[in-house]
Regions:
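Basic/polar N-terminal segments that are highly enriched at the extreme N-terminus
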Residues: 1-10, 154-157
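Ligand-binding loop in jelly-roll beta-barrel domains
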Residues: 69, 89-115
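Conserved GNAT-family N-acetyltransferase fold
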Residues: 40, 61, 85
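Short beta-strand segments
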Residues: 49-51, 72-77
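Short acidic-glycine-tyrosine-enriched beta hairpin
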Residues: 7-8, 74-92
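Acidic/histidine-enriched, glycine/proline-rich intrinsically disordered or flexible terminal extensions
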Residues: 119-157
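Glycine- and acidic-residue-biased ligand/ion/polar-headgroup-sensing regions
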Residues: 56-68, 73, 82
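A short glycine-rich, His/Asp/Glu-containing loop-to-beta-strand
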Residues: 12-51, 57-58, 108
Length: 157
């Protein structure tokens, strides 16, 4: 029997990735793996991941606080608190924090594939080559496990 999940403000699993911290709030175990949810906090004046696209999951970003800069393909959008960005499979995207305050995003994945991606990156960062962190090739291999690739081109274009 699947039980409910209530995660308090200090709960969840924390994954630190450079200037960002991901707090996993729902890893899919309560939702039959239909939905994963994380809270991403990005340091001021920080970029996010390289622009990339997913083949097998939708991704949502709700701006809780701060202002996000979303780039989708060639278009960029400054998104203040209260903005929702939904990214379908095949759409290249990234985000950044251009502001002076931390950016907090509520991040959803349907299905929950990307929760394990964050865990895999954490493990890789712990075994990366010195202070330089993991290589681009190693990160690319992890991305490919989750049908994700670095690109700024829409799938099918």
């Amino acid at each position: 029997m699947i039980r409910e999940s209530i995660v308090g403000p200090d709960g969840g699993e924390v994954v630190r990735l450079g200037p960002a911290t991901v707090r996993i709030l729902e890893d899919g175990s309560t939702t039959g793996h239909r939905l994963g949810i994380g809270e991403i906090t990005v340091a001021p004046h920080s970029s996010g991941p390289p622009q990339h696209r997913h083949a097998r999951h939708d991704e949502g970003f709700y701006v809780v606080s701060g202002t996000a800069r979303f780039t989708v393909g060639a278009a960029s959008y400054d998104a203040p608190a209260g903005t929702l960005a939904m990214i379908p499979p095949g759409a290249p995207h990234t985000f950044a924090n251009p502001g002076d305050e931390p950016l907090v995003l509520l991040n959803t994945f349907t299905p929950d594939l990307y929760v394990q991606y964050f865990r895999d990156l954490r493990e890789l960062a712990g075994s990366g080559p010195g202070a330089g962190g993991p290589t681009a090739e190693a990160v690319g291999e992890i991305m490919s496990r989750y049908a994700t690739e670095v690109t700024d081109v829409y799938a099918g274009d």
